[in-house]
Structures are given as structure tokens and as C-alpha cells.
Amino acid sequence: MPNVIGVQFQKAGKLEYYTPNDIQVDIDDWVVVGSKRGIEIGIVKNPLMDIAEEDVVLPLKNIIRIADDKDIDKFNCNERDAENALILCKDIVREQGLDMRLVNCEYTLDKSKVIFNFTADDRIDFRKLVKILAQHLKTRIELRQIGVRDEAKLLGGIGPCGRSLCCSTFLGDFEPVSIKMAKDQNLSLNPTKISGACGRLMCCLKYENDYYEEVRAQLPDIGEAIETPDGNGKVVALNILDISMQVKLEGHEQPLEYKLEEIETMH
């Protein structure tokens, strides 16, 4: 079980793990590391910790150093240059008539590479675009096609709830979300009601799903005949949050509500 440090390269981004290399770091320290993209600067989110080997990609790389003022200045300068590179790329994309939507642009710390993230409905032949960009920017060019959920994460925004998007605020990874989760929570299945800014099912459908599944497994099915303190009847509705059910009793016009524990005492 290796000792590692969790480093994040963007807000709410996925953690990448590095060995400390005998360097003492604290949470929120800026560090210089070698990533799969090149030399980058990131922020420490998890200090020294033990982690199972199956949860990391081996072999682990070392932290190079704690970022100094020169590194921070270079990082900030790179961000300004990335804004200009993004404008340039958008102009070239427009001139070339490419059907792609540029999302953002990032330089590695040593400027050995510039990465453009984009979305597109189909595969794009961007070989000519790469050639033109390389002539202008004098560095290696990487064009990376991402999905709409990643686009929302990078750009940020406001969700239907009126709060900042979860994916751009605190969600490191996207977990699978299904329409069944909305059904289990008795939510409207209208796509406009359960879709996020990205157009996909809202990530928050997952948050309470485990609770709903746990409680639902304890409650009887709708239509099931059960025995209550007031006689026999059929379940006509369930209230997951209240852990209760409405039961239509024989000889009663209106259903009565019972807590789960009231029914359990009958058995």
C-alpha cells in the first residue's frame, strides 16, 4: 500500500496521485509535478495518505518541488497566453469551417505543449488546424475532444436549483446516473425537469438514491395486501421520506396512513 499525495489540476478536477519524494507538503500547497501531459502545477488536496495499489496508476511519479513565486508567476502568465491562444484557435476554426466548439485552452507549465479542449457531434479532421496552430504558437499542439458533461464541468454555470453546478464545484468524478433513479424517487420524468446544464441526467439524482433503494426494499409493494392495526387492506401509495404507506382498508372510503413500524408490529 503506497504512501501518496493527491494533487488536483483544476477546481473539482479528478485527483492524481504522486509519491512525496521526501518533500513535506500541506493541503492547498502548490506543487510542480510531471503529468501525462507534461510539467504542470497543481494544488495538494490530500496530504500524505495510504492508498490501495488498485486505486492508483502505477508506476507513480514523484513530486518535483513545491511551487515557488517564479512558478506561480509563470502559471499566471501561461493562463493569459492561453486566453489569446483560444481566441486565435477560434478564428482559425471559423476560417476552416470546422464544426467544433472550443471549450478552453491550457498550457503546460514549461509551455512544451498547449491543449485545446473541444466538443463536436462527429469526428473532426483537425490535422490542418494543428499545423496552422503549431506555426503560430511554436509548441506542441494537442486537441482533445470531450463530452458535454466535461464541457459543463470546465465552463461552470448555474443549475436548475439555482446553485453552482456540482460538477464544477466539488464532484471529482462523474458517476453513472439512470432514469430508474428518477423513477425510484417519484420524480417527474419530463426531461426538462431532470436534466442538467449539460443536457444529461442531473448528477444529483445519485445523491439520495441509496437511501431510496434501502427504504423501498423495506416497504410493501403498491397493490400488496397487508394487515394493519385497523384490519386488512391494500397498499395504494408509498411515502419514502416519511417511511410510511397509505392503505385502502376494506369498508373504508379513504385510505389511511401507517408508518412502517406500525405494520411491522403486526408480523
Labelled PLM ranges:
Residues 48-52, 238-243:
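Short, conserved beta-turn/loop elements at beta-strand boundaries and strand-helix junctions
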